[in-house]
Amino acid sequence: TDAGRRTKSTPTLLLLKRSSDTKHTRNGHDSVRQWSDNFANRLVLSLERMLPNYNVVRFSDRNSTMMACHACQMRAFHSAKVVIGMHGAGLSNILYMNPGSAVVEFAPYANDARCLPGGGPFSRLAAVISHHYMMHHPPTEEYKWTAGRTSEFNDTRFATHIRNFLASIDFL
């Protein structure tokens, strides 16, 4: 949920959501990088099921209050233990996360050098700040296109991949 279920002992996982029709979204024409609100809600639910010890918070470009408050964005990223986002969807804000946090970059295109570990800006930034980094790239045949210029993919497989990554770095 946008508000999440915040407690001091529950680590926060931020799920960055891009929309095709907000003033904050660049590349609004790139439907593979946009998720509908309905699909984003399904992703949150899948992540909550797989990661019950995390406070899963949707960080959306539709939240105009958050988008207008840079200090609020910095605080949100600083308090997150895990950030998951589409390539370019505000991932530069991982700069404000604590060292040793986890970053998952969703890479929608095969063989895109911007997303290759060590070759893309976010994997390099994660390395410099000592974040754990993982890239998720769903198979092309897994994508579904919606009428609203958005994409969907297998949310259960995605959440399982995230859980396995977090288990591998002792974040569960």
PLM region spans:
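The feature primarily captures lumenal catalytic ectodomains
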Residues: 1-172
